[in-house]
């Protein structure tokens, strides 16, 4: 009996993969892809000044306009519950990392009304120049199928509103 050659094995594997892909596509199922978003703003303040304002986990209620209240559990890991000013939306977020030295924290959504899953975000402050800092808000998430644009627009609006408020608080 003749051993299959590498070419034959590769050809057979390629055919199986192609058939599998065709079967997957014929089911009208689309693969899930993670999306990323990052926004930043330069602020006329020192790193320490900016971090003291935005660093506490529940300080978000002071710089994110839609947030009416923030309640922090204080456990480990810390959780916060955000309720919008109109009371119509609630977000529960878990802090997953925090670095006072790195002037950053990361969090995930435990529950959210936004059309996303697997949301993970980081807010950090970095020095830019003398008396100027940059606030960076970034995330990865999986948008709900058919809601990709809605998810991106909602998150972009949230990030831009928050960053604009941070900048305004330090504008002289």
Role assignments for model-derived ranges:
Residues 41-48, 54, 115, 149-160:
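Soluble non-cytosolic domains of exported or imported proteins
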Residues 27-74:
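Hydrophobic ligand-binding cavity/cleft-lining segments
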Residues 34, 77-79, 102-104, 130-134:
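A generic structural signal for beta-strand entry/edge sites
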Residues 2-19:
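Bacterial N-terminal signal peptides that target proteins for export
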Residues 134, 140-172:
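A conserved amphipathic terminal alpha-helix motif
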Residues 16-31:
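C-terminal segment of classical bacterial N-terminal signal peptides
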Residues 50-53, 60, 80, 95, ...:
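Hydrophobic pocket/interface hotspot
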Residues 72, 86-130, 140-142:
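Hydrophobic-ligand binding "helix-grip"
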